[in-house]
């Protein structure tokens, strides 16, 4: 019996690896759903505001290192995330970010080539009818407060007109994956157990037409959702 169980486990592992190589997006979303469900009680308000088809941009406050997991587990459509390019260059994570089709981005003064490529990729992704998610603050909060929304969203909308859906995450500040603890995440293992299976909520607002979008307006809407 132990031998049969071992063989069955090995076959399942091989099947999982094969599915990942063929359908990495499906596998990653499955993992996102699995991880979020065992760690949190996740609920979503306003899911009907996500367009059923066509390109759109999601914006969200940046509370922790697992924001993308919660969003991916909650929104049924595939999502491509825009991420600071230096994170995508971390050796052990390069393959993961590539398979997840993460779009690396840099500031104008850092790497103009990366920035230009990011804008082109974002535009093409939206034209292909896919969803792009950005965190307009540009950083994970260190205070729990909402930071200033950068104007990158306005640059994106200069070349293509798509709906923009404002969202906010609630319940992750103070978690093991946030920077509440001396500005460092993943540094207080005891917090992981303390907050285990806490409630996390994703609030999805009504989408805005591209011509009505400014970084300032999105920030105001986010603050209203957070109140």
Stretch-by-stretch model annotation:
Residues 38, 52-111, 174-178:
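Catalytic core of membrane glycerolipid acyltransferases/transacylases, capturing the structured
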Residues 144-213:
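A cross-family acyltransferase "interaction/gating" segment
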